[in-house]
Amino acid sequence: MGALTKADLAEHLHAELGFSKREAKSMVEAFFEEIRSCLRENEQVKLSGFGNFDLRDKRERPGRNPKTGEEIPISARRVVTFRPGQKLKARVEDFDESKVVH
């Protein structure tokens, strides 16, 4: 099973909805840029029926160098989290392996 890429999304828009390849690529890029922009502005991104992208601030915490065992601090940082919505969770849970074309 492979990964879905932005190029795959653009190809789908081209094949299914009739957009030119250039338009489809631009639409995909604009979609992701809007998500990035909102997150940069500390806004939550809610995609109904899919899920939410949130920002979370993590405090500094102790860590350890796995090679030497030396304790080193892991610096405070902001991370992006994704919480799937109920509809997405239900679709994933109802997944039927027998229907997959290999």
Swiss-Prot record:
**Example of a GO cellular component annotation carried by this entry:** cytosol
KW Transcription (keyword) present: yes
Q: Which Pfam families match?
A: Bac_DNA_binding
GO molecular-function annotation terms?
DNA binding; structural constituent of chromatin
Give the record's keywords alphabetically: DNA recombination, DNA-binding, Transcription, Transcription regulation, Translation regulation
Query: Which BP terms in the Gene Ontology apply to this protein?
Result: DNA recombination; positive regulation of metabolic process; regulation of DNA-templated transcription; regulation of translation
Disulfide topology: none
Output the InterPro entries linked to this UniProt entry.
Answer: Hist_DNA-bd, Histone-like_DNA-bd_CS, IHF-like_DNA-bd_dom_sf, IHF_alpha
CDD domains in the record, alphabetically? IHF_A
Q: Check the record and name the Gene3D superfamilies matching this protein.
A: IHF-like DNA-binding proteins
Similarity field: Belongs to the bacterial histone-like protein family.
| Matching PANTHER family | DNA-BINDING PROTEIN HU (PTHR33175), INTEGRATION HOST FACTOR SUBUNIT ALPHA (PTHR33175:SF2)
Subunit info? Heterodimer of an alpha and a beta chain.
Its biological purpose: This protein is one of the two subunits of integration host factor, a specific DNA-binding protein that functions in genetic recombination as well as in transcriptional and translational control.
Protein name as annotated: Integration host factor subunit alpha
Q: Which organism is it from?
A: Chromohalobacter salexigens (strain ATCC BAA-138 / DSM 3043 / CIP 106854 / NCIMB 13768 / 1H11)
The gene name reads ihfA
